[in-house]
Amino acid sequence: MATNKFLSILLLSLMAFAAILLPMISGQIITCLPGECTNPSECNAACKSNGYKGGACVSMSIGSTTGACCCKPNFKSQDSFKSNDIIINNN
C-alpha cells in the first residue's frame, strides 16, 4: 500500500517536472518586458519594435487590472523547413 502511494507521488512529480522542463529545453521561453502592461496594443507595438512577432498583456494574478507585457518569439519551427535544392548522390 505504501509502495503504491509512493509510486503515485513519484509519477506525479515526474510529470510536473517534465511539464515545466520541456518548454525550457525546446527554447520556447516567453520574454516579458519590464514594467506594467495596461494597453495590449502598446504592448504589441513594443514587442514588434524589439524584433518579436507580437505581444500581449499577461495578468500575473487573478483579478489584477495590470499585467506584464510578454512577447511571442519570432522564429519558425525546424519542422517547417522546406528546401528544393537538396542533391542526392547515389555513387
From Swiss-Prot:
Residues 1-27 form the signal peptide. It comes from the Eukaryota. It is found in: Secreted. Disulfide bonds join C32-C71, C37-C57, C43-C69, C47-C70. The keyword Secreted applies. GO terms for biological process: defense response to fungus; killing of cells of another organism. Keywords: Antimicrobial, Disulfide bond, Fungicide, Plant defense, Secreted, Signal. One of its GO terms (cellular component) is extracellular region. Belongs to the DEFL family. This is Putative defensin-like protein 83. The gene is LCR46.
